[in-house]
Design a protein with these regions (language model features):
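Conserved, mostly hydrophobic/aromatic
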Residues: 15, 67, 153, 190, ...
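Solvent-exposed loop/turn segments at secondary-structure junctions
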Residues: 18-21, 71-76, 128-133, 157-163, ...
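Aromatic-rich peripheral "rim/lid" segments of glycoside hydrolase catalytic domains that contact
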Residues: 23, 84-95, 170, 177-183, ...
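Active-site groove signature of glycoside hydrolases
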Residues: 17-25, 50-96, 124-126, 219, ...
Length: 255
């Protein structure tokens, strides 16, 4: 039995996408209501939204241990065709221009807003491709150069059944590099494998969790989205079967 109330009230991650749609490397579009805002107005909107959502959680007695500012923000966030207000970070096509300073400032804006509501919450900057050290050095060098405020470097990792060993090795090496290079804690914020490859998924997760535990600065490994069952709604990387029961993959978290 899974107690969602317990999960929600004790240790949880709150992830703000700052978009009308699911934000990921292919889509970091700002909310329609924020179109046309100046840079200062965008930051004010980010602050207000972040504080509103977190205050609502606080009112319900929910205290997130961690809060993400953005979701898989390797290509930046709050894209715009106008460089003056864009938070793009390249790699997202010529339509959405790069502005390293804005991206860094958006991260800081979100972080400051989080701390105003939950001073003890740790703020995560979360990127895709946890095995891609070049991406992580690129983004976090930029954040360092611009004095961005955050606490934790978060990663996603979604290997296939034939790539998990090499990707796990690369991800672990990347985490160690992030700790050494930036003196930050790290976390696997998202991990997953096809629900119908449960035995291989368990083997992968067991190895990833064991190696992550050996890194003192690694805060944990989170599966996304385990309760998506049997390819529900086209999503195949959950960890529940077609009957709605957990697969053996979840046993890896018992270690």
């Amino acid at each position: 039995e899974i107690s969602l109330g317990l999960v929600g009230s004790e240790m949880c991650i709150r992830d703000s996408h700052y978009s009308d749609v699911w934000a990921d490397p292919g889509s970091q579009h700002k909310p329609a209501a924020w179109e046309g805002l100046s840079l200062d107005e965008l930051k004010a909107a980010m602050t207000a939204h972040t504080k509103d959502v977190l205050s609502a959680l606080k009112d319900k007695g929910i205290t997130p241990e961690w809060v993400q500012v953005g979701n898989e923000t390797g290509p930046g966030m709050l894209w715009d065709t106008d460089a003056a207000v864009s938070g793009g970070m390249g790699g997202n096509g010529v339509e959405y221009v790069e502005n390293k300073k804005n991206f860094s400032d958006f991260i800081t804006t979100g972080c400051v807003a989080v701390k105003e509501v939950f001073p003890n919450a740790k703020v995560i900057v979360h990127l895709q491709g946890g095995d891609d050290n070049n991406l992580y050095r690129w983004i976090f060098d930029v954040l360092k150069e611009n004095n961005a405020q955050y606490d934790v470097i978060g990663m996603s990792l979604y290997p296939g059944t034939d790539t998990w060993k090499t990707m796990t090795s690369s991800c672990i090496a990347n985490m160690k590099d992030m700790v050494s290079r930036y003196n930050k804690e790290v976390m696997i914020c998202e991990v997953g494998m096809s629900w119908d490859e449960a035995a291989t998924s368990k083997e992968f997760l067991t190895e990833l969790i064991a190696q992550s535990k050996a890194i003192d600065e690694c805060l944990g490994v989170f599966y996304w989205e385990p309760q998506s069952y049997g390819g529900w709604n086209g999503y195949t990387l959950g960890a529940f079967d077609e009957s709605g029961k957990p697969t053996v993959a979840m046993d890896a978290f018992n270690q």
